[in-house]
Amino acid sequence: MSDILQRVGDKWTVLVVGKLGDGPLRFNELRNAVGGISQKMLTTTLRGLERDGFVTRTVFPTIPPRVDYELTELGCELLKPVAALGEWARKNTARVNAARARFDAAVAETSVR
């Protein structure tokens, strides 16, 4: 169970699954939509999601080749908890940042002594 939680709790997995929730995307479309992800990390994330059954990869016989990524039924089931996590993060970002600032200030104060 921990390996599955590790996969679905990964930052990039959450972002990729969220973007694919709007429909199939090509690699570069997905990379642009996610933002801040390297080509290598996106490749690794997509391969892991495909291996675990969350994403399908479809290669179209065109020139140049076209590859689409799409959520499977299992991936679509993951959308609801991913969306809830994203909503929670948006709602609580200020509170988390305030807690971090208080903690950092307390640590800085004790290290000065």
Q: Which sequence ranges carry the predicted segments?
A:
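Beta-hairpin "wing" of winged helix-turn-helix
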Residues: E50-E70
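C-terminal regulatory/oligomerization modules of transcriptional regulators
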Residues: R51, T56, E73-R113
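Hydrophobic residues in alpha-helical membrane-spanning segments
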Residues: L25, T62-R66, V82
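Short, flexible helix/strand-to-coil boundary loops that buttress conserved ligand/catalytic motifs
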Residues: R31, V59, V82
